[in-house]
Amino acid sequence: MTVAKLSINLSGLEFENPLILASGINDKVPEQWIRAHEEGAGGVVTKSIGIEPRKGYDNPTIVELPYGLINAMGLPNPGWKGFLEMVEGYSFDFPLIVSIFGGTPEEFAFLAEKLSEVADAFELNLSCPHAKGYGMEIGQKPENVYAVVKAVKDATDKPVIAKLTPNIDDITKLGLAAENAGADAVSAINTLKAIAIDIYARKPILSNKVGGYSGPGVKPVALRAVYDLARTLDIPVIGIGGITTWQDAVEFLLAGASALQIGTAVSLRGWKVFREINEGIERYLREEGFSSVEEIVGLALE
């Protein structure tokens, strides 16, 4: 029996398989990145890192719903200096994508310069829906996306991935801005702006009131975004949003995603999701007569 090839090359980086741990709530420390890889992730995106340390919002920061989670963590992170101290002494045998956020193109560029030694690539958080002055507030405008990507590309020779917000009328405008500025890839989607209300307290549950919705409920929205981006752009698209089963993963690949990120499914189903999804993809490829993941990317676009 010939095993189908799961390994991929993305922007010059070699991944054992197309599954990447998404930036979110399961990737704060190196031990979690290593665990993700041991459990079958081909690579890892870190928690978003800023210039100064941030405590994040007070609890409650997460609400579990029947079809996903709403979170408003508030971008808690140790700052770039704390991040460098945290990774000191570690070496990783998988691609480490460092997520960064800032309030201006200059801040993004500064972080890329400072963290280039430890990052195999950068993911630009242009899409967090609940942090004032950051993320989506910057990334909803194509001209801002262009300026940030260009500044980071000028500051580092590492691959640059722009993470796009779905909270906009046409996500391809953002994708084209990133591509025109020299981005090596885009990732989509970040969470959908959302709220949950306690009917007895008669007020929003999250301390920040508004958060980002992720998980199985956002999958069709994410899939459509990936499909539209893959039809429009020449650079790779990394699919994110509600991927929970191998069937979900195959849908995203067929819709044009070159790689996939998984976050909420780890919270809901445990680290085993990486292995289960990889096994399902490999079995699907074999049974359908394909020899590699790359052969099915974008087949649904034709």
Swiss-Prot record:
Cofactor note: Binds 1 FMN per subunit.
Binding site for substrate: K47, N71, A72, M73, G74, L75, N125, N190, T191
Protein's pathway: Pyrimidine metabolism; UMP biosynthesis via de novo pathway; orotate from (S)-dihydroorotate (NAD(+) route): step 1/1
Pfam family, one: DHO_dh
Annotated catalysed reactions: (S)-dihydroorotate + NAD(+) = orotate + NADH + H(+)
Active-site residues, record numbering mapped to chain: C128
Cited function: Catalyzes the conversion of dihydroorotate to orotate with NAD(+) as electron acceptor.
Family in the record: Belongs to the dihydroorotate dehydrogenase family. Type 1 subfamily.
Name of the featured protein: Dihydroorotate dehydrogenase B (NAD(+)), catalytic subunit
Taxonomic lineage of the native organism: Archaea, Methanobacteriati, Methanobacteriota, Thermococci, Thermococcales
